[in-house]
Regions:
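N-terminal module-boundary/linker segments of secreted carbohydrate-active enzymes
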Residues: 60-113, 117, 309-312, 321-361
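Catalytic His-Asp segment of secreted/periplasmic serine-dependent ester chemistry enzymes
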Residues: 226-329
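Conserved SGNH/GDSL esterase-like catalytic core that processes O-acyl groups on lipids
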Residues: 98-189
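Structured segments of extracytoplasmic/periplasmic soluble domains
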Residues: 94, 98, 106-111, 174, ...
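Bacterial Sec-dependent N-terminal signal peptides
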Residues: 15-77, 82
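Structural recognition of the beta-strand scaffold that forms the well-ordered cores
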Residues: 87-91, 116-121, 169-174, 206-211, ...
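Sec-dependent bacterial lipoprotein signal peptides
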Residues: 1-21
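Acidic/His-rich structured neighborhood in mature extracellular/periplasmic domains
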Residues: 162-243, 249
């Protein structure tokens, strides 16, 4: 009988304990019964996911928001894939001719960098026309090429021939000047870039975009009325188009801001004298400004420290050109007022610099 009472007491105690457990708060029950887990992880979630995020959503992005647009800039410094000679090809028109055919080689030479420079040229050629000629194999290009400081010009070439001629380190594209500020005309740019990359022998080729310049204020160019025949309107529209292009065309590594450099230079004592006919660049300091922009944009080297000056460009003009280019590479789509160059010098040397340009003949 005594044993029977003990058993009943034990059973009663067990029932009481169970009743107490059933009254615990839910979190206390989970705490007392859960398995040991890795400290710092939330039980019940996949250890590989961040608690609180929706599975299947990249934890690095905020669901429901668009990724931040790329900030427009010059490319990262481009280097020679062969370790010796930097090879640059422009797919362009007369505005790429203005920028790279006359002084760019000498600037690189003064910096200690050997270059080969090519320009696939058709006057006034648009993005759409470049793509059409690529697709149909038209041999309508002049292939201008600078090797060892000597320029040659071969007519009747196709775009594919120019792309495959060298193992180019950088290939640039651009829009024709009249359409440069009309972003709707850029719709085939990605297709043109895809063609270039598919046919380039250097699979790591850098694609850059050449931002061209606004016309002079008194330009009579037939397409100037698209911009209300106003220089700053045209410049701002070019910047807007370049910004949108850079966001939409991820294959473009950066901008070569010749247009901003020219606009910067126009704030100097030289004023609105950077065009020879209202739209093409003035042959001497105008073209030199664009060339200075290209070398800094492609190398990241401060062009104001480069020793080269063409014989036909004065000391002061060269300083304006280099300062304008350097400022443009710092602020790609913003005009910088060249406050240090507001007054024309009383005398300005045109004596030959220590490094002279090669004779390119008539351009």
């Amino acid at each position: 009988m005594k044993i029977y009472k003990i058993v009943l007491s034990i059973a009663a105690a067990a029932i009481m304990i169970a009743a107490i457990d059933s009254c615990k708060k839910p979190e206390e029950q989970e705490e007392s019964g859960k398995e040991q887990v890795d400290p710092g992880t939330d039980p019940g979630t996949d250890p590989g996911t961040d608690p609180g995020t929706d599975p299947g959503t990249d934890p690095g992005t905020d669901p429901g928001t668009d990724p931040e647009p790329r900030v427009i800039s010059i490319p990262k410094p481009v280097t020679a894939s062969d370790g010796t000679t930097l090879k640059i090809l422009a797919i362009g028109n007369s505005f790429s001719q203005d920028a790279i055919e006359q002084y760019l080689y000498e600037l690189f030479k003064a910096s200690g960098q050997e270059t080969i420079i090519g320009n696939m040229y058709i006057g006034g050629c648009t993005i759409d026309t470049h793509l059409a000629k690529a697709n149909n194999g038209a041999k309508d290009y002049e292939y201008r090429k600078v090797v060892d400081g000597v320029k040659t010009n071969t007519v009747g070439k196709g775009l594919l021939e120019g792309i495959k001629d060298e193992n180019w380190d950088v290939i640039t594209v651009q829009q024709a000047s009249g359409s440069s500020g009309i972003y709707s005309t850029y719709s085939n740019l990605n297709a043109l870039i895809d063609y270039v990359k598919a046919n380039a022998s250097n699979k790591d080729v850098v694609i850059a975009f050449h931002q061209t310049w606004a016309y002079s204020s008194n330009s009579t160019h037939a397409e100037f009325p698209k911009y209300n025949s106003d220089q700053m309107t045209m410049y701002n529209m070019i910047c807007d188009a370049a910004t949108q292009m850079f966001r939409d065309c991820e294959s473009v590594a950066g901008i070569i801001p010749s247009g901003t450099a020219i606009q910067n230079a126009r704030t100097s004592y030289l004023g609105d004298t950077f065009n020879r006919d209202g739209y093409h660049l003035e042959i001497n300091y105008g073209r030199f400004t664009a060339a200075c922009t290209w070398i800094e944009a492609l190398t990241g080297q401060d062009v104001t420290t480069n020793t080269y000056r063409p014989a036909t460009v004065s000391d002061s003009q060269a300083k304006v050109a280099k300062a304008a280019a350097h400022a443009a590479c710092q602020k790609v789509i913003e005009v910088t007022d060249l406050v240090d160059f507001k007054t024309a010098p009383t005398s300005d040397s045109l004596s030959l610099p220590s490094v002279q340009e090669e004779d390119f003949g008539v351009i």
